[in-house]
Amino acid sequence: MEEGMEAPKFKVIIVGGSIAGLTLAHSLSQANIDHVVLEKRASIAPQEGAFIGVWPNGAQILDQLGLYHSLEKLTAPLSRMHLSFPDGYSFSSLLPKTIHEIFKYPIVSLDRQKVLEILFQNYPNKEKIITNQRVSEVRLLGDSASVVTEDGSVFQGDLIVGADGVHSRIRSEMWRLADELHPGMITPQERQTLTVEYACVFGISRAIPGLRSGEHINHYGDKFCVITFHGKDGRVFWFIIQKLDRVYTYPNAPRYSPNDAAELCDKIQDVIIWRDITVGDLWKTKLVSSMTALEEGLFETWSLNRIVILGDSVHKMTPNIGQGANTAIEDVAVLASLINRVVHADALHKPSESCIETMLQKYKTLRYERAKSTYERSRFGARFHTRDNWLKALVGRYVFQYVGGLIENRTSKTLAGGNVIDFLPRPHRLETGCVTRLPKGQGRPQQQWTLLWVSSLVLFLFLPWLRSYLPSATFW
C-alpha cells in the first residue's frame, strides 16, 4: 500500500434490526468495525405484545456492552416461582433467587419493545440503522457481497449477517445461492427442519391483585401451559402455549388472528393458575396481546461464502425456558469476537474470502453444540409443561417438587459456559462470580437423580391406581 493511502475498511451488513442484530451492531461499534443495519419495518421498536426474559448468560454480554444497567432498572428481579396443576395442587420454589446468587445476575422480564428502544437509543451511530429496507436479493461478488432491497438500494460489504428471525430472507437467499454454487448442499431434510406443534398467545397485562412483582407462575395444564412473569409496578408478562392437533412443517403452519387468541383464552378462562387467579384475569387486564405459531428447529447450514445467519434464523425454540433471545445474544458474542480477530489481524489488508469462510466455520463449531443443547432443553420444556404424555404428567405432578437440586442443576448447566465477547472487559459484578462455569459443588445431584428414577418407577407400577386421581385422560 502506498504511503498516505487509507487501508480498506471491512464492512458488515446486518440484516434485521432485531435484538441480535442491534447487539451485533453495538459489538462491532466497540471494535471499530464498519457496519450497517437494515430493518424491513418502518420502526425499530414496534409494540407487538411480545416480551423477553434476560437470563444471566445474556445479561453478562449486555453488561459488557454497557447496556444492562438500562434494562435492569426497568425490571423487578425474579426471586420466587409458583407451580400449579389441574387438580389444584401447587408448590413454590426459590430457584430464581438461587440462580441470581450463583450467577450474579437476576432473571428479568420486560417488553421486547423496551429492549429494542434501549439498544437503539444507546447506539452511537444511528445513521447506520436504516429502516424500510426489505431485502429482495443477495449477491456474491467474489471479493465482496451485496444486498439489494425492494426500493432498489444496493448495500455492498464484506460479510452479510442474517439476524432477521425465523422467516429469514437471508437464509432463503443463502439456500438459493447454495443451490446454484453447490447443488445438493441444502438437503430436503434441512428444508423441512422447522416444525410447528404448538401455538402461543403472548400478552402483557396491568397489575393484578395477588400477583407480586418479582414472582413467576408456571401452570401445567393438559396439552397447554400458562406462564407468567410479574415485573416492575406489577406489570404482568404472560404466555399460553397450546398443543396443536397435528405437526406442521414450515412454512405450512397455521396463522392466527386476534379472534383466535380471544377464542383460546375464553375456552380456558376459568382455569385457576395460582390461588384464585384465573386465565380470565390475565385476559381482562391485558394491555396488548398476539397469537402466533411456535416454530422449532435447529439448522445444519449456518453459513455460505460471505453469508452467515444467527439467532432465530438458525435455531428456533419455544419460549418455555426463556433462552431464545439469550442464545441469539451468545451467537453475537462469538461472531463479533471472531470478526474482530480476523479484521484486526492485518491492518493493511482485508481478510480474504477463504479467511472469512474459515472464520464462519469456526463460528458454527464454537456455537453448535451449546445451541443444540439449549434447543433440546427448550423442546423438552414445552412438552413437559404441557404434559403431553402420561410420564411427563406424573413426574411433574408427583416428583418434580422433591428434586429441586436436580432442576437447579439442569438450569445451571443451561446457563453455565455462556459465551462472552473476548475483546471487551469482563463485567465488574463477575469479579466475585462467573457465568462461564458452575460453582464448585454444582452439577452433581446424584441422590436426586436416583430419587427421580426410583419415583418414576414406583409411579409406573402404580399407574392404574393413579389414573383415577388425575384430572384428564386425554393423554393416556
Curated annotation (Swiss-Prot):
Cofactor(s) recorded in Swiss-Prot or TrEMBL: FAD
GO cellular component, one term: membrane
UniProt EC number: 1.-.-.-
GO biological process: terpenoid biosynthetic process
Membrane topology: Single-pass membrane protein
KW Ligase (keyword) present: no
Binding site for FAD: 39, 53, 112, 312, 325
Pathway: Secondary metabolite biosynthesis; terpenoid biosynthesis
Residue positions with a glycan: 409
SUPFAM superfamilies reported in the protein's UniProt record: FAD/NAD(P)-binding domain (SSF51905)
Key words of the record: FAD, Flavoprotein, Glycoprotein, Membrane, Monooxygenase, Oxidoreductase, Transmembrane, Transmembrane helix
Subcellular location: Membrane
Catalytic residue list: 220
Pfam families noted in UniProt: FAD_binding_3 (PF01494)
Phenotypic consequence of gene deletion: Drastically reduces the production of andrastin A.
Family matches, as Gene3D superfamilies: FAD/NAD(P)-binding domain (3.50.50.60)
GO MF annotation: an example: FAD binding
Coiled coil segments of this chain: none
Transmembrane parts of this sequence: 449-471
Role according to the record: FAD-dependent monooxygenase; part of the gene cluster that mediates the biosynthesis of andrastins, meroterpenoid compounds that exhibit inhibitory activity against ras farnesyltransferase, suggesting that they could be promising leads for antitumor agents. The first step of the pathway is the synthesis of 3,5-dimethylorsellinic acid (DMOA) by the polyketide synthase adrD via condensation of one acetyl-CoA starter unit with 3 malonyl-CoA units and 2 methylations. DMAO is then converted to farnesyl-DMAO by the prenyltransferase adrG.
Similarity section: Belongs to the paxM FAD-dependent monooxygenase family.
Protein name: FAD-dependent monooxygenase adrH
Taxonomic lineage: Eukaryota, Fungi, Dikarya, Ascomycota, Pezizomycotina
